Amino acid sequence: MRKSNLITVLIVVIIAIAGAVIYRTQFPAPAPEATLLPEGIGIAAAEAAVQALGNQGKVVLILPKRGNFKNPMVEVQQAAFAKTLARHKDLTLSATESIEVERPGTMGAGGMDPAEFQQLVQRHADATGFVSFADFPEFSKEALASLKGKKFIVVGGANPALKSLLTGGVVQAALVPRTKPAASNKKPGSAREWFSATHEVVTAANANSLP
């Protein structure tokens, strides 16, 4: 090999190594909980659906949408949910929908259009339950009445009326961040353990634990 060619090869190798170092510095590998926690949320949401629906029926999954932004963590939740639900043959995932959660000038659960959520539910009249990774909108009493007969599992606790929604039987289960530390101090390992360490499932039975 000519000396000039050897120098060129060495320069290319050095540039490649430098690029790899810069990439790892600027874009380090995510901490385990970065993917394990959303996976655990997806698993726990499916388990809550099975519990609430009696292991049978049709489920519609509702994902949050923020314009054109694609959140990879939501994709992890979705995949874990679908995989866990698929183990229960009599409970099927009949549809997956997305709903805008950040209308201009709003934030949190208030950023979702209640009318859009209501229309989504009406489009799936044959569904037994709905699992919303987009939280639950703030409905009027009249609008809530139109949701009777359906069961809802909600991921998120931004709705200030969540406690009354649970005790009133509108929402069957909510997956929310823990208000008190988990009983175990052991560092979580699996995705499900990460969920249990940081979140909890709230139903009508323990809704008083909510603030």
Label every PLM stretch briefly:
Residues 2-211:
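A residue-level marker of the well-folded mature domains of exported/periplasmic proteins
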